[in-house]
């Protein structure tokens, strides 16, 4: 691979860097305890599993765990408010009593995002949030992600395979190849036929859609 999964694991404390530092709000994450990190950044991994009988509301409630001590909440009312908000913003409140195992792929992804939102962080990491989803659910997830950023000021850091989705829904992109960053910046500034050819080894034509670059095979 190009190295994006490794970079994602480094940024989310699943791997330790061999050298250098990774800073979150000016603080080296290597020195953060997991609880401290979880109060600042939430993560939705590409593959997620839950017990078959676990309800949506219970799963989303686990997002409050970083604020609990010995399994007890210091403020149950605040927990309930955050859970209710997370269910509402992801349009999953009607699913709250359903077992997670009974949900569709798109519903499950929104529920996992709801759990991350219940953590009440300013940074949200997403690893391939649209993988294996039908295009309708992909668009629902991407529009939700954009809304979280635009309306609620949450910084979104996500790994995407689809180049056009990356270009359209991102304010800044990082193109990687061979474990190194090839380019980084605004989509419209860094995406060129030469870059695409060198990274993807294909010939593409670049057009503009809503002010964003859109690539088409030629």
What are these model-derived regions, one by one?
Residues 12:
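Helix-to-loop junction immediately C-terminal to a conserved catalytic motif
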Residues 20-28, 37:
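Conserved ABC transporter NBD signature motif
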Residues 61, 76-95, 120:
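Conserved ABC ATPase "signature" region
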Residues 99-103, 107:
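Conserved ABC ATPase signature
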Residues 124-128:
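Catalytic Walker B motif of ABC-type/P-loop ATPase nucleotide-binding domains
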Residues 173-186:
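H-loop (His-switch) and adjacent beta-strand-loop-beta switch element
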Residues 198-218:
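ABC ATPase nucleotide-binding domains
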């Amino acid at each position: 691979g190009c190295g994006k999964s490794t970079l994602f694991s480094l940024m989310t404390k699943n791997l330790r860097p061999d050298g250098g530092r990774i800073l979150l709000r000016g603080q080296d994450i290597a020195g953060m305890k997991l609880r401290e990190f979880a109060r600042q950044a939430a993560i939705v991994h590409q593959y997620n599993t839950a017990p078959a009988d676990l309800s949506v509301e219970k799963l989303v409630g686990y997002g409050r765990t970083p604020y609990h001590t010995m399994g007890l909440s210091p403020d149950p009312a605040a927990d309930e408010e955050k859970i209710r908000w997370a269910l509402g913003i992801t349009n999953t409140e009607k699913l709250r009593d359903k077992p997670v195992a009974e949900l569709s792929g798109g519903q499950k992804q929104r529920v996992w995002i709801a759990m991350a939102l219940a953590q009440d962080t300013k940074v949200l990491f997403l690893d391939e949030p649209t993988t294996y989803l039908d295009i309708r659910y992909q668009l629902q997830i991407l529009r939700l992600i954009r809304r979280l950023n635009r309306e609620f000021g949450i910084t979104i850091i996500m790994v995407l395979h689809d180049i056009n989705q990356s270009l359209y829904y991102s304010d800044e992109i990082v193109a990687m190849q061979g474990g190194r960053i090839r380019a980084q910046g605004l989509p419209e500034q860094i995406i060129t036929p030469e870059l695409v050819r060198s990274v993807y080894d294909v010939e593409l034509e670049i057009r503009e859609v809503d002010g964003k670059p859109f690539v088409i095979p030629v």
